[in-house]
Amino acid sequence: MKTRALAVAMIALLLLAAGVALSGQVASEEATAWAKKTLAGLSLEKKIGQIICFDLAGGYIAEGDPRLNQWVRLARDYGLGMFVFYGGTPRDVAHLLNRLQKEAEIPILMAADFEAGPGQQVTGASEFPANMAFSAAGSEDLVYRAASAAAIEGRAMGIHLTYTPVVDIAWRPENPAEGVRSFGGDLDLLGRMVRAYVRGYHEHGMLTTAKHFPGRGDVEAMPGNPGWSWINKPAGDVVAQEFRAFKHAIDAGVDFVMSEHIAVPSVTEGSELPASVERKLATGWLRDKLGFKGILTTDDLWYDNVVQRFGTEEVAVKAFEAGHDIILKPKDPAATIKALAEAVKSGRLSGRRIDEAVLKLLTLKARLGLHKNRFVEESRVGEFVGTPDHLALAQEVADKSLTLLKNDGVFPVAPGRPAKAVNINVQKFDGDPSPPALTVKLAAAFPGIQSFNLRPDPEPAYYDKVYQAVQDSELIILSLFVPRTRLGDAAPFREADLAFLQKVIAAKPKAVVAMAYGNPHLVRKIPSVAAYLIGYGEKGWFGNQAVYFESFIKVLKGELKPSGKLPVRVSEQYPIGSGLSY
């Protein structure tokens, strides 16, 4: 503990020396005065520019690149107050963000989506397992430490706001809309995780966002409105479940809430408008009844169906009328600024309402000290991003969250065994890099193991080849890379793959071990496996899968005993809290 405390103190001192504020969470009189003075000096159009957030593509961007020219114009000429970035390396990110800060009259609040930590967006930064992993480990300390590490790395690169945590509650196993992005289905546990998460970010100088209000954990497609989603259940259930989760986040002190394009007719007197444009949700519920006083942002307004219905400019005006403070990723920022300005001049929108939103944002910038120093030292980014301690923390989270849901005499594996083993990678998407990476790891750990990849639509002869290898094996590993679908099947195996897996299980009922990477629900379709383990990292943005390769290999070698507990209900047989040990 002393060593860690010293390391944290050293990092804090180095960050301060680099001009990265770690404190300032309460606005001082001086900061408030700066915000008010700055607001008073802005034209209507520049005020509106402050409340527009546009996206940046990461990676190396050369001077003269048309994309950079556009971003510079938006920062310098239109006064955009926020940008959200995606991709790049740590030095590339720091350089680009410094470049834009240099062009802006007012410091820019830089945002990113750190659901799995900075490594979700930045190559070489730390990437952690998904939210559900922390609940499976049941450790507020792990959440706090991961959030702290993410904030340290983010601020070192010039990022001030994360569009996390996801606080969507996972209720129904037949509709796992958010999957491992969710902290799970236990509201009290979710509340504890969110408090630790927000505290870790705040104590290390980054702002947080609760999303996706009114809740995306139990949504369905809306009949008669193709592409629209709704929460179709009684008002009392919505308030006790979805809204209670957001109340936990509000009480934890989140700075932003992100609304989603989701309708809740049961709490809006039958209105089928989504929260992004429905005042009864954005203001009536979130602000007036749940007590949120911070900044309310829309979700992406680029191509969603709500934009298709109302149009790019009109949807921004409607979002502001509903009570939003920030317009996220409009397709045309200049046109959006013009539309909002015209709405103010016509009397449709209140100029005072614009001022209130801008003042909130400026005050947050001052709280972070950006009015004094908006830049980071690019040469020192490597001291803080993707450090060995942070990477080790990601592995610790995986080790402590790995969940053994079923064990019919397979574990612990006897020393020296298995003598003959087969690994079958079942992958939903062709080109997924995870199965080949796992194959390499397993081959290094167990020389002689045979690995096969069930890619989309294999030839029948390939199934025969794999089945023949199974006959001579003492252990058959099913490595499952089959993520849930957003609004549909929780365990979307391809029919041919599922039939083959069931054939393998029937042939070797005591020898088949399934390891699910990112989807707890797959066991429902292969219930007869001898053992079933879960790791909480899903292909794409939703958690580090690779750390679970190491955890699983440790279990096979007898170096790790799974201790995670299921934080979401899979079935009546596997309720919340399920998880074996030995």
Where do the PLM segments sit?
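Bacterial N-terminal signal peptides
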Residues: 9-18
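Preference for extracellular/luminal or secreted protein segments
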Residues: 22-74, 288, 309-582
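Second-shell residues forming the walls of enzyme active-site clefts
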Residues: 43, 83, 93-108, 112, ...
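Short acidic, glycine-rich surface-loop motifs adjacent to enzyme active sites
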Residues: 51, 55-57, 71-90, 173, ...
